[in-house]
UniProtKB/Swiss-Prot annotation:
Gene this protein is translated from: glt-6
Any Gene Ontology CC annotation: plasma membrane
Extracellular side: 114-191
PANTHER family listed in its UniProt record: SODIUM-DEPENDENT EXCITATORY AMINO ACID TRANSPORTER GLT-6-RELATED, SODIUM/DICARBOXYLATE SYMPORTER-RELATED
UniProt-recorded Gene Ontology molecular function terms: glutamate:sodium symporter activity; L-glutamate transmembrane transporter activity; neutral L-amino acid transmembrane transporter activity
Topological domain spans for side Cytoplasmic: 1-15
UniProt-annotated glycosylation sites, renumbered to this chain: N175
Name of the protein: Putative sodium-dependent excitatory amino acid transporter glt-6
InterPro entries: DAACS, Na-dicarboxylate_symporter, Na-dicarboxylate_symporter_CS, Na:dicarbo_symporter_sf
Membrane topology: Multi-pass membrane protein
TM annotation in the entry: 16-36, 55-75, 93-113, 192-212, 234-254, 265-285, 303-323, 386-406
Highest rank taxon of the organism: Eukaryota
Bias kind Low complexity: ranges: 505-517
Length: 542
């Protein structure tokens, strides 16, 4: 029995080598991080420890843009425009529903557990940056503006964002004072890839290609092959994930400051957020999946383990996108046309973990300041957290989102810096939650559109055509029918008839297997010539 169990474990490790190595890298990173803290390593040493992880993250982020272009266009180009619209509407509706449910769950848990303790306010907490003029309307308008970039090339490295600039009047008042400072809204560009705008562009591009039909077949084939090449490259790069994840986690732990004074309060805060994220992942989302599909959600969890661990290690949904696609298609059986559309869109707007985290963080800060939020303010927090999680999902660490919600309900922003000490952990957990949510979304969308996908395959199935062509080539290569070449007697007979007819065009086609256009009934199947052709030495070659 023990020998069989050991053999099963060895077999599992062999079949899931990358998964085992990735999980071990997370454990190793935590052990090294806490084990090396007493050594008080220098900044140069910390920089060297973080260096492999930084390179790994840069390589993964490098693949985001070509992966989105190739996967989205290749998937939508093989679908009908009506089916693409239904898929997009279903996906967005699901993401909005789960974000609202996550926000409600977070507000409920933080109200019941009550992790905020006003007695620790005596602790010296550094001031956090403030952007008090940003409103939910600005966030929503920025979201829409970024959906339609004026320059698709610029969208690969910049996105639009509303800021408020303080302007001092140039003309002094009559009493000699300079007057009040005027705050003016400014719409500018900030660094960062505008993924939402790129997704909108690729979606339209792919739908137009699908409408062109056979005329755009060569373009479809190009993007399908490009997608396969990029995915093969990504699979190769993922073998460097264990080293990168170990260095990232170890470096983050070594850079933490001493948090012993507020450890108990922060521990309860972390417990509240993690409890909400876990409940949302194992109860809310699976229940929605079961009610819609009537299928067991456990295979989705099992198939996405590798992607979830990678998301926890990298703390980046975009960097995990290639691994998510591979797990969803290979282990969960989701159609690539669905996964290549839903996952890139989900990495931008599906931020259930962020919505829950932001709602808990805002009410936690209110509890620290002994502020009792009214029902209207709680509703404001829930709505703003949902909008901010979608519109500002790509902002690192959720800083702007939390500041936005705090200013909406009039809470102080100085306590946000306290949350940074544990945000490295919560960021990884909520990223894993978002990745799993994307997987369930893709599975549910496939269930809803399965009949339409089958109908599309029946109308025009590239895979079946390609398979048929391959089988035809195989049958030709294995055919026992002998190949022929023209004998000397046949050549002489052919030249005699050609000279008699005086047709120079026929003379230029000596050796052709096509039938002549004259009265000469000479072809490779002519049985009147004895023997017209002789077999080649190797009759197996085509």
């Amino acid at each position: 029995m023990k020998s069989k169990r050991r053999d099963d474990i060895v077999q599992f490790c062999r079949e899931n080598t990358l998964l085992v190595m990735t999980m071990f890298s997370v454990f190793l990173g935590v052990v090294l991080g806490f084990g090396l803290r007493p050594l008080n390593l220098s900044q140069e040493t910390l920089q060297l420890i973080n260096f492999p992880g930084e390179i790994f993250m840069q390589v993964l982020k490098m693949m985001i843009l070509p992966l989105i272009f190739s996967s989205l266009i290749s998937a939508l180009a093989q679908m009908d425009a009506k089916e693409s619209g239904q898929m997009g509407a279903s996906t967005v509706l699901y993401y909005l529903s789960t974000a609202v449910l996550a926000t409600i769950l977070g507000i409920f848990l933080v109200t019941v557990i009550h992790p905020g303790d006003p007695s620790i306010k005596g602790t010296d907490i550094s001031e956090a940056p403030s952007d008090g003029n940003v409103s939910p309307l600005d966030t929503f308008l920025d979201l829409v503006r970024n959906m339609f970039p004026e320059n698709i090339i610029q969208a690969t490295f910049e996105r639009m964002q509303t800021t408020y600039v303080a302007i001092r009047p140039k003309i002094a008042s009559k009493n000699g004072t300079s007057g009040n400072i005027i705050v003016k809204r400014s719409i500018g560009m900030t660094k960062g890839m505008n993924i939402l705008g790129i997704i909108v562009f690729c979606t339209g591009f792919g739908i137009v290609i699908s409408q062109l039909g056979e005329r755009a077949r060569i373009v479809v084939d190009f993007f399908v092959i490009l997608d396969a090449v990029i995915m093969r490259w990504v699979v190769t790069l993922m073998w460097f994930a264990p080293l990168g994840i170990t260095c990232l986690i170890c470096g983050n732990l070594l850079e933490l400051d001493d948090i012993s004074d507020i450890a108990s309060v922060l521990a309860l805060y972390v417990f509240t957020v993690c409890a909400g994220l876990i409940l949302h992942t194992i109860i809310t989302v699976p229940l929605m999946y079961f009610f819609i599909t009537r299928e067991n959600p456990l295979p989705i969890f099992k198939g996405m383990i590798q992607a979830a661990v990678t998301a926890f290690g990298t703390a980046s949904g975009g960097a995990t996108l290639p691994m998510s696609m591979q797990c969803l298609e290979d282990h969960c059986g989701v159609d690539r046309r669905i996964s290549r559309f839903v996952l890139p869109l989900g990495s931008t707007i599906n931020m259930d973990g962020n919505a829950l985290y932001e709602a808990v963080a805002v009410i936690f800060i209110a509890q620290l300041n002994n502020v009792q939020l009214s029902l209207a303010e709680v509703l404001t927090v829930s709505i703003t957290a949902t909008i901010a999680s979608i519109g500002l999902g790509s902002v690192p660490a959720g800083l702007v989102s939390i500041l936005l919600i705090l200013n909406t309900v009039g809470l102080p922003v100085r306590d946000v810096s306290m949350l940074f000490t544990v945000d490295w952990l919560l960021d990884r957990v909520r990223t894993a939650v978002n990745v799993l949510g994307d997987a369930f979304a893709a599975s549910m969308v496939q269930h809803l559109l399965q009949k339409k996908l089958d109908q599309a395959d029946a109308r025009h199935d590239y895979k079946t055509e390609l398979k048929g062509e391959i089988e035809l080539l195989k049958s030709a290569a294995t055919s026992r029918r002998p190949s022929f070449t023209m004998s000397e007697a046949s050549k002489e007979l052919f030249l005699t008839h050609a000279n008699t007819a005086g047709n120079s065009r026929i003379g230029s086609r000596i050796g052709s297997r096509r039938p002549s256009s004259t009265n000469l009934h000479l072809s490779w199947r002519n049985n009147n010539i004895e023997p017209p052709y002789t077999p080649l030495p190797n009759d197996e070659n085509v």
